[in-house]
Design a protein with these regions (language model features):
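N-terminal Rossmann NAD(P)H-binding glycine-rich loop of SDR-like oxidoreductase domains
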Residues: 13, 17, 21
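A short, exposed helix-loop element centered on a Lys and neighboring polar residues
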Residues: 110-111
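Active-site loop of short-chain dehydrogenase/reductase
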Residues: 71-72, 117-127
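Substrate-binding pocket helix/loop in short-chain dehydrogenase/reductase
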Residues: 86-87, 94-99
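Conserved NAD(P)H cofactor-binding loop of Rossmann-fold oxidoreductase domains
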Residues: 78-84
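Rossmann-fold cofactor-recognition segment
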Residues: 46-59
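Conserved glycine-rich Rossmann-like NAD(P)H-binding loop of the short-chain dehydrogenase/reductase
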Residues: 29-42
Length: 127
């Protein structure tokens, strides 16, 4: 089904991201990439995934062309940050971290990868 296709999943070390990667791998996906904030979190059964260590909280400061020098066919924006606190107690720094990881990083990755998807006239994005 996904033979000769490439996938990038943000948050691939979490339970949902890991399941997504496993599904694509078991269905013939050629190359699977994922982002993580800490390569130590990578599980031993994830050796088929090529991980990129990336701080999604500061993605606007990164050179995405250099970091992601490849195209993908499928982009799954799965990474998310939750600061367990009620809204009234949330600090501005916590709010900014949540927005940066959950929204701004997705915007920057979408902008980077969809240009290439449009050019080759194929691509799928899951948010």
């Amino acid at each position: 089904m996904f033979k000769d296709r490439k996938l990038l999943v943000t948050g691939g070390t979490g339970s949902i991201g890991n399941s997504i990667c496993k599904y694509f791998n078991s269905n013939g996906c050629k190359e699977i990439y994922s982002t993580t904030t800490n390569l130590i979190k990578v599980k031993s059964d994830q050796d088929y995934i090529q991980f990129k260590e990336l701080d999604l909280n500061n993605i606007e400061k990164l050179n995405l062309d250099e970091l992601f020098d490849f195209e993908v066919d499928y982009l799954v924006l799965n990474a998310g940050l939750n600061k367990d606190n009620i809204f009234l107690r949330m600090s501005s720094d916590d709010w900014n971290s949540v927005i940066n990881v959950n929204l701004n990083s997705s915007f920057h990755l979408l902008k980077h990868f969809t240009k290439k998807m449009v050019k080759k006239r194929f691509g799928r994005v899951v948010f």
